UniProtKB/Swiss-Prot annotation:
Allosterically regulated by ATP and dNTP. It comes from Levilactobacillus brevis (strain ATCC 367 / BCRC 12310 / CIP 105137 / JCM 1170 / LMG 11437 / NCIMB 947 / NCTC 947) (Lactobacillus brevis). Monomer. Residues 173-321 are annotated as: Effector region-2. This is Adenosylcobalamin-dependent ribonucleoside-triphosphate reductase. GO terms for biological process: DNA replication.
Length: 749
């Protein structure tokens, strides 16, 4: 639990009212609707969701009060004045949508959930799948000591963080899975449930048995028995109990029977307090426990493989989705020469059952050159992605040269690949929209500096897992990002950042590659902004007496957050110059009448019952300028070159990028991966998909169609909703089938 502050900073109603008059939020075409259904929290006393100023106030106050100086016995007036001014600046910045913290912070910061759960403000995590000790953590199985290693630990970490709404990258590279012990014994798993439970019939249908009858016929003397409390931790510990029973080191009595009692788990549709939403009942957990136990039983007498470990991780992810977190973001990182791992999604039955739950990537270093089989798999399946651990461990920005071991503990990334992470470490994100910030009168150095300080404060949260606390205290890693990059480059430099290519011989491979030429003014500006972030972090670290951050900058994929401000997503190019963006709503959503009354096209979804599809016409920024290029027009080579530019001059962490390619470009994937092996820390590729099916999420249109669609919109939906409902809303209504990034890998909030 977070330590209560001795003094606190708050924003006055007078300040907020004055800011509302002074600044107009830069809502994108879908911005307000996306906000209302994603980040506006329910206010039970008023029977409505938050309005934007209330959300920003909550978020800013939740962050500014993490400053450790506020926990001192005596807090000076100077500190309170300094932090109040900073809170006001942050409010102006975020309220205007010139910048935002991560979607996770928009949803959680300033809530009771933040104070109860130390991990709450971090989007994503990384864990190495090898036997580890639980340490001084909020979860510790009763049969273990803190320093006793257990096979279950990385899976418990993964399960816990996914249920708290985070995403998890996990490594099943050979050096990790080879540390797994041989599976010693089969386990006879029994799941019992009270016949009075509302979940009884559904659970029995999945293999659970009547608790009263089982207890009458059996003794607990020779079994490992665990009665699950109705908590997140109970689900985690049930799985740990079953997993660890397979190994003599964590089951020295060699008991082969495990009995798990799920009678106390709340039934389906009961409210989940804290994170929000409603419960699934125990049924997804029952299915998962039997499935994971079967994998372990099948492995008796041998070590677990990367595929086994990924399957178990995917089954956990599947359970969390069914458990009503809505999405669980996973990235499995395997060996570049592990054919079984690389091809595991080709088994369609397993893919549809659980292997869909992770994006899969392979770990390489710059000496790796055999990209042909990987490129072939990418061309046909869009996977695996590439993560260059050697670059991540020894480089910040590429322009700063090799810095041996600067980040030597890195073992993987978060699911979207923009932050290289050590074992147990989270990403910690904030992004600035440079075009919007400049329009609203901000000096970009100041905006990025506020982002550095915001993320630095998050590192002073109290973290639930010892492995995370150690990594954060050592690294204080932050990830200040920018989004709308293509918009800002076109607006500022009047051309795209890649101005051409020139042939260059690669002595290592004997090949000739086309080396990109960059706009020098852009090089200089990105470099200056990077230095501003580093200076802001250094100055704040000096003030707080803590470690400067090991790395500072990144490019996150964005998506939902970029929609708020209506900017291009991360470094990605706009999907099209003009398009129809379709958003799906639950058919009971109170926003739908307001959308229809405002002139938006609303129709039943052709794929899902109880769902309505709404069309929003969207025009890309600078769509009519000669230098504009959409994702369907820009070459794969230019996308690689743009990612390399950002890795060289801006990001000392990594750059999240999903490179899209046309069918005729597939043959070039291998050579481009080879060309940029010394430059790009992580990347993924997907075929560019047009809108060749009904109600596609994005459908390119021409300018005339866009203008006609806009003519049909006769009112502002926020004003119409207020007029029709008095802003009274309905609890737990979300958009259907959202994704927060190009690859669909991120949690939304």
């Amino acid at each position: 639990m977070n330590t209560a502050t001795q003094a606190s900073v708050s924003l006055t109603p007078e300040f907020i009212a004055a800011t509302e008059k002074e600044i107009t939020p830069h809502w994108g075409e879908l911005g307000w609707v996306t906000y209302k259904r994603t980040y506006a929290r329910w206010l039970p006393e008023q029977q409505r969701n938050e309005e934007w100023p209330e959300t920003v106030k909550r978020v800013v106050e939740g962050n500014i009060n993490l400053d450790p100086r506020l926990q001192a016995d005596t807090v000076t007036p100077e500190v309170l004045t300094e932090l109040t001014t900073e809170a006001q600046n942050l409010f102006r910045l975020i309220y205007g949508l010139a910048a935002t913290p991560s979607g996770r912070n928009l949803w959680i910061s300033g809530t009771d959930y933040q104070h109860r759960n130390g991990d709450a403000l971090n989007n994503c995590w990384f864990i190495a799948v090898r036997p580890q000790a639980y340490g001084d953590s909020h979860i510790l199985p009763s049969y273990l000591t803190q320093d006793q290693v257990a096979v279950s630990m990385p899976f418990s970490f993964m399960f816990d963080q996914l249920m708290k709404g985070g995403g998890v990258g996990f490594s099943v590279t050979p050096n990790n899975v080879h540390q797994m012990p041989v599976v010693d014994q089969t386990v006879d798993l029994t799941i019992v449930i009270d016949p009075e439970s509302a979940s009884y019939a559904d659970s029995v249908a999945l293999g659970a048995v009547n608790r009263s009858e089982w207890m009458h016929d059996n003794s607990l003397a020779d079994v490992r028995f665990y009665r699950l409390p109705d908590t997140r931790e109970g689900w985690v510990l049930a799985n740990a109990n079953m997993m660890d029973a397979h190994f003599n080191s964590t089951n020295p009595e060699k008991k082969t029977k495990v009995v798990l009692d799920i009678s106390d788990i709340r039934p389906k549709n009961a409210p989940i307090h804290g994170f929000g939403g409603t419960a699934s009942g125990p049924m997804p957990l029952v299915e998962m426990l039997f499935d994971i136990n079967q994998i372990l039983n099948n492995a008796v007498g041998r070590q677990l493989t990367a595929v086994d470990c990924t399957d178990m991780g995917n089954m956990i992810g599947k359970t969390v989705v069914a458990g009503n977190v809505r999405r669980s973001a996973e990235l499995a990182l395997g060996g570049a020469e592990d054919d079984a791992f690389i091809t595991m999604k080709q088994d369609k039955d397993q893919l549809y059952h659980h292997r869909w739950a992770s994006n899969n990537s392979v770990a390489v270093d710059s000496d790796f050159t055999d990209y042909a089989p990987i490129a072939d798999s990418i061309q046909h399946n869009g996977e695996p992605g590439i993560v260059n651990l050697g670059l991540s461990r020894n480089y910040g920005r590429l322009i700063d040269g090799r810095q041996e071991g600067i980040d030597e503990a890195v073992e993987g990334t978060n699911p979207c690949g923009e932050i290289s992470l050590s074992n147990g470490e989270p990403c910690n994100l904030f992004e600035v929209f440079p075009s919007v910030a400049e329009e609203q009168g901000w000096q970009l150095e100041d905006a990025f500096g506020l982002g550095a300080r915001y993320t630095k404060r998050v590192t002073f949260s109290h973290y639930d897992w010892e492995v995370s606390r150690k990594a954060i205290q050592k690294n204080r890693r932050i990830g200040v990002s920018m989004s709308g990059i293509q918009d800002w480059i076109l607006k500022t430099f009047k051309q795209r950042v890649v101005t051409g290519f020139e042939a260059k011989h690669d002595a290592e491979t004997g090949k000739t590659f086309m080396q990109p030429i960059y706009n020098q003014a852009a090089v200089n500006r990105f470099n200056a902004l990077y230095q501003a972030v580093v200076k802001a972090d250094q100055d704040y670290s000096d003030t707080l007496g803590c470690q400067p951050s090991i790395k500072h900058t990144t490019v996150k994929p964005s998506g939902t957050v970029a929609k708020l401000a209506g900017v291009s997503e991360g470094m990605h190019f706009h999907y099209a110059r003009y398009l129809i963006q379709r958003i799906r709503f639950q058919d009971s959503d109170p926003l739908l009448p307001a959308l229809k009354a405002s002139g938006y096209k609303v129709e039943p979804d052709v794929y899902s019952q109880n769902t309505m599809c709404v069309e929003f016409p969207v025009k890309a920024a600078h769509a009519d300028e000669p230098a504009f290029a959409s994702a369907g027009e820009v070459s794969m080579a230019e996308q690689f070159a743009t990612q390399a530019f950002l890795q060289t001059y801006w990001s000392d962490n990594a750059v999240s990028c999903t490179v899209t390619f046309q069918p005729e470009e597939g043959q070039d994937i291998s050579d481009l991966l080879l060309q940029y092996r010394h430059t790009i820390k992580s990347t993924s590729l997907l075929p560019y998909s047009g809108a060749d099916f009904k109600q596609a999420p994005k459908e390119p249109i021409d300018a005339a169609t866009y203008d006609a669609k806009c003519q049909e919109i006769t009112a502002d939906v926020a004003e119409k909703f207020a007029a029709m409902t008095g802003n009274h809303d309905q609890k737990d209504i979300e958009l259907v089938d959202q994704s927060d990034c190009e690859s669909g890998a991120c949690p939304i909030r």
